[in-house]
From Swiss-Prot:
SUPFAM superfamilies: Restriction endonuclease-like. CDD domains: YaeQ-like. This is Uncharacterized protein YaeQ. InterPro entries: Restrct_endonuc-II-like, YaeQ, YaeQ_sf. The gene is yaeQ. It comes from the Bacteria. The lineage of its organism: Bacteria, Pseudomonadati, Pseudomonadota, Gammaproteobacteria, Enterobacterales.
Length: 181
């Protein structure tokens, strides 16, 4: 018998001062049995960074043809494709040709640094690609917010994400390895 996903619920309040975006949302995250808590929380952090009422989580690890989250327009085109991890060039190219904007969130300090050294020259050819990096220490702190039922406040200003719940406050600094040109 296959293991089932664990369901997490997040009620979020986002004040993105950089994009003048203010939003309250109730999110459901399905954590696949093979997904770490850190990776799931990075998915949530990516959602917060690009918060929009139309931004949706996809089937994620269960679907090779979909991103972790996407923002689809009224014509079913993809305005934003959010990817996590260390994808190969083929996957990046697919995302960048299908979506108007692509945001890649990398993690796992040692592997991510090596991946970036090997793929930086390939990534720069995609003008609609952002590559973000979150180091292990910060990811562990973000992961500490994980709970089956979460109520989170995120304030984003000057690229910094201030994350808080009823017990914790955290300043999250994503490193921009590449921004769209």
């Amino acid at each position: 018998m296959a293991l089932k996903a664990t369901i997490y619920k997040a009620t979020v309040n986002v004040a993105d001062l950089d994009r003048n975006q203010f939003l309250d949302a109730s999110l459901t995250l399905a954590r696949h049995p093979s997904e770490t808590q850190e990776r799931m929380m990075l998915r949530l952090l990516a959602w917060l960074k690009y918060a929009d009422e139309r931004l949706q989580f996809t089937r994620g690890l269960c679907a090779d043809d979909e991103p972790e989250a996407w923002l689809r327009n009224d014509h079913l085109g993809i305005d934003l494709w959010i990817e996590l991890g260390l994808p190969d060039e083929r996957r990046i190219k697919k995302a960048c040709t299908q979506a108007a904007e692509v945001a890649l969130f990398t993690y796992n300090s040692r592997a991510a640094q090596i991946w970036w050294q090997q793929n930086q020259s390939k990534c720069v050819q995609f003008a609609n690609l952002s590559v973000w990096y979150l180091d292990d220490e910060q990811l562990a702190k973000v992961s500490a917010f994980a709970d089956r039922t979460m109520t989170l406040q995120a304030t984003i200003q000057d690229g910094v994400i201030w994350l808080s719940d009823d017990k914790n406050n955290l300043e999250v600094n994503l490193t921009a390895w590449q921004q769209p040109s």
